[in-house]
Structures are given as C-alpha cells and as structure tokens.
From Swiss-Prot:
It comes from the Bacteria. This is Holliday junction branch migration complex subunit RuvB. Has 3 domains, the large (RuvB-L) and small ATPase (RuvB-S) domains and the C-terminal head (RuvB-H) domain. The head domain binds DNA, while the ATPase domains jointly bind ATP, ADP or are empty depending on the state of the subunit in the translocation cycle. During a single DNA translocation step the structure of each domain remains the same, but their relative positions change. The RuvA-RuvB-RuvC complex processes Holliday junction (HJ) DNA during genetic recombination and DNA repair, while the RuvA-RuvB complex plays an important role in the rescue of blocked DNA replication forks via replication fork reversal (RFR). RuvA specifically binds to HJ cruciform DNA, conferring on it an open structure. The RuvB hexamer acts as an ATP-dependent pump, pulling dsDNA into and through the RuvAB complex. RuvB forms 2 homohexamers on either side of HJ DNA bound by 1 or 2 RuvA tetramers; 4 subunits per hexamer contact DNA at a time. One of its GO terms (cellular component) is cytoplasm. It comes from Caulobacter vibrioides (strain ATCC 19089 / CIP 103742 / CB 15).
Amino acid sequence: MTRVISGEPQHGDLAPADRALRPQTLAEFVGQEQAKGNLRVFIEAAKGRGEALDHVLLFGPPGLGKTTLAQIVARELGVNFRATSGPVLNKPGDLAAILTNLEANDVLFIDEIHRLSSNVEEILYPAMEDHVLDLVIGEGPSARSIRIDLAPFTLVAATTRAGMLATPLRDRFGIPIRLEFYTPAELRHVLQHAARKMGAPLTDDGADEIAKRARGTPRVAGRLLRRVRDFATADGADRIDRKAAAMALARLEVDESGLDSLDRRYLRAMIENYGGGPVGVETIAYAIAEARDAVEDVIEPYLMQQGFIQRTPRGRMACGKAYLHLGLTPPAAPPGQAQGALFDEG
C-alpha cells in the first residue's frame, strides 16, 4: 500500500538527498523532548562509567524517527552502529554472526523486532542479559552445546507493535521509550529545516499548511514537502506559500485533517456499510480491500489519535467527528448514552 501520507518508509525516502536531511545529534533532533532528555542522561551516564548503554526499546507509530534515534544513540556514544531487522534474521546463525562481530559497547539496531522468529529470539535472551551466546552444534545424539562469550553491547530495537513482543523479551529492555505524534509547531520546525537543506522556497504559512496535514509524522511531512515542491516547480511558482501548498495537497487528495482517499474510504465503509460500527477489523479490512496489518498499523493509529474512530470491546466505532468530516449527520446517542459520548475522541 503506497500512500503519500503513509508513515511507512518508501523508496523515495531512502534517496541520498533524503538521508542528508536527517538529524545527526540529539540537539538537532526536533520533538520527542521527554525521550531525548532521558536518553541524554542515560547516554552520559553510560559514557561516564565506560559501560555499554542499557538495552533500548523504541516503540510507536511508523515515521516518528525510531531508526534515526538509534543511529544518534550510537553517534552520541561514539561507538559502531550495526543495523538489521527482524524479518531477515531467519536462523539463530544469522543473529550469531552479527553478535560475534560486535566490538565492546557497540550498538546493534533491530528494526521490526516484533517479527523476530521464536528460535532466534531464544538465543537473544542470554546475549542481552549475560553477554553470552548458547548454540547447539550438530543434530541428534552427536549434538553438543557450546557457549561463546560476547562483548558487552547495546541492543536498540524498534517496533510499531510493542504488544506483540513476548514478555521475556520486553522485560529485558531497561530503557523503553514511546515516541509520540508530533505537534504542528514541531512539524513546522522540521519542514523549515528540511526546506533550507533542500533549497526549497518555503514560506512560514506554507510550512504551516503542510504541517497540519502531515499526520503528526516527520516522514510524512518530508514526503509532502518534496511533492509540493514538485508541483511548485512544474507550475513555475517562485515560492511555496499557503496557497501553493494547499493547491498541491488538494491534487494529492490530502485534506486539511491529513486524511487521504483511503482514510475517507475506511470511514465511509464503516459508516455507510456498517452503521458506524461496532465492526471487526477483519471485516473493515475486507471491505476496503486492504490487509489487516496495514489497517491496524498504518490507517487506524492516526484516525484514533485524532478522534475519528475508537476501539471498543465489540469492535471499531466511528465517532461524531468522522460523520462531520464526511459531511454527514451524526446519529442521535442511543438510550442511556449521553450525547457527548458520541463525540468522545478516545
């Protein structure tokens, strides 16, 4: 599912020009003030003691800077950075090869750690806790177990689905950090910084217009800025002001609340096909022809955070804000429910 407002990484996000926009230090990293403040303390303490930083779990919606923060942690510590991801670690040997090549206090970054297979996860436990690797060599009666000592290291893991982590794995992270959606003011700062590096003629009100439609996500803000710049160049505009940004975003079908055609299709299906809910995630995913994981990880987090939908024990329900956004009249509150509950943004 490729959407200009998706927080998931896309091919264009990996271009050298885009990587050059990423902050290199905690001081340059905009937003996530509490997370940055705590990380700064933990990093300085580890450096002062000459020890490896405790293991870090970064979790939250996609596009908020988990990978960038992991790289910054290694840079601030002054150690090597090695990156991999859960889906590519198919066998214990894959992870063992990485762990045995780490130097003292290095940072190992595992993205999408919730997708780590159970047999790989099991050898990670003693590695994280005791800095040892327990491997079984051979099969059957001739199989034998060997133990390999590892250099102390820091595992920085990222996930959009912390609830899927096994409790023993989750409990081994001494520094759990949740990343939150950005405010429009923070995104404006991100956009202005990116525009300067790109040489894009972005005005303050143009930055505000993009920021309010960027779904609280820096990755989305950067992608929208690049697309808006493309339209401005094609139209011969000498600057990207509010009017130019709004026109470009309208052509991209991104509305003033940051919703695109898929978001609106999701809300419309819930309201028109299922009376506003409650409806199960499998049902709504089938109705809009999208995978359940995409619905849960990409579509729903922002809709819930903005109060368009809510989860209940019986399924998803549309809030009053969703009806109004689509130009529809919200239904009356059912007997025994206060009218205000219909507009509950939980």
